[in-house]
C-alpha cells in the first residue's frame, strides 16, 4: 500500500547525534498462526527512519503497532520482509536498541541504583565508570534522591523514569517505547512527555514510540505513521508541521488532531463493520 506523501515541516529536523542509527523497514509482514486460524497482523509495511528522528506509530488497538515495534526490537521475527538498522539486518535483540515497556519491567528485588546499573554490570563496565554513569543519568531524570529505594516504593511515573534511565545508561542509538506513559495520570504523563523531549533533544537518539493517543503523537513526534486496522498497513505517513514547544490549545495543533482522528476513526469503523457482518477487514 502506498503511503500518502509526508506533509512539510515548518522547522528543520535537528541533526542526529553521532552514532544515531537509521532504520529501514522493507515489506514487513507478520502472520500469527496457520490455516484458518491465521491472523495477518502486519502487511507490506515499508518505511525509512533517519537517525535521530522521533517517530510515533499511531492507530487503534490491534493495528500492529506493537507487533512492528517488537520486530524492530528483534523480539519477534517477521514472516516476510526485512528490517535493517545502520545497514545491518535485525534478526534478534541487540545492545543497539533499548526497549521501554508500559509495564515498567523493573527488577522488584533491586534498588533504583541497581536497576539502572544492571546492564552496565552485565557489560562488565568498570565500577567507577558505572558509578559515574548512574549518578549522571539519575541526576538528569530526578532520581538522585531515590537510588536506595525499591520499585514498590515508587509512583508509576518514578518507575518509568527508572526504566528510561536504565536504557540511557547503556546509551543505545535507538530507543523503542511501547505506550510507556499509557498507564499514567494526565499530569504525570505530560511531565514525562516533556522529560522525554528534553532527553531526546540532548541525546538525539532515534526514537520509535507506540501510542494510541493522537494528542501524545502530535505533541512528541517529528513524524507520525498511521497504521490501518488488521492487517496493519501504512495508511498515512506525515511530518508534524509544528515548531517546538507545541501548544496543545493552538488552532494548528487541533486541526492536525482532527485530521488524525478522522483517519483513526475510519479504521475503527471498518473493523466494527467487519465484525458485525463477519466479513474480512481487507
Predicted regions and their residues:
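The feature captures the beta-strand-to-loop junction immediately N-terminal to the Walker
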Residues: 58-60
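Helix-to-loop junction immediately C-terminal to a conserved catalytic motif
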Residues: 73
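Conserved ABC transporter NBD signature motif
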Residues: 81-93
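Short coil-to-helix segment of the ABC ATPase nucleotide-binding domain corresponding to the Q-loop/switch region
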Residues: 110-118
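Conserved ABC ATPase "signature" region
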Residues: 117, 121, 128-146, 198
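Conserved ABC ATPase signature
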Residues: 150-154, 158
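A short, proline-enriched helix->beta-strand linker immediately N-terminal to the Walker B motif
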Residues: 169-173
